[in-house]
Amino acid sequence: MENKIKVFENKQVRTVWNAEEEEWYFSVVDVVSVLTDSANPRKYWSVLKTRLKAEGSEVTTNCSQLKMLAPDGKMRMRDAMKTRDILRLVQSIPSPKAEPFKMWLAQAGSERRDDKE
């Protein structure tokens, strides 16, 4: 697995490339931060995750724990989702940035696949 930082509107989004699955995984907290501009995106995600579980949403069941670089420079386990699951998550967050983010996500998610072809 390869860790990489991508940037959307000057905000970092941590990603991990899973070569076995040929899939990008995106940090859920980073995506929440980008879409909400929340002062505490980790708390926002925690509340949203609880609400989605209560509604019976499958989005949270497709959430993996992957090691990603933390602000302190250490590798820590973080919630991460594949591109298609992040797209579903984006639909549950009211944000004017949702559409531009989806376009960016499609481009970012296809990067490695294009390199392979």
Label each region the model flagged.
Residues 1-26, 33-39, 61-117:
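Positively charged, aromatic-accented nucleic-acid-binding surfaces
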Residues 33-58:
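Compact nucleic-acid interaction/catalytic patches
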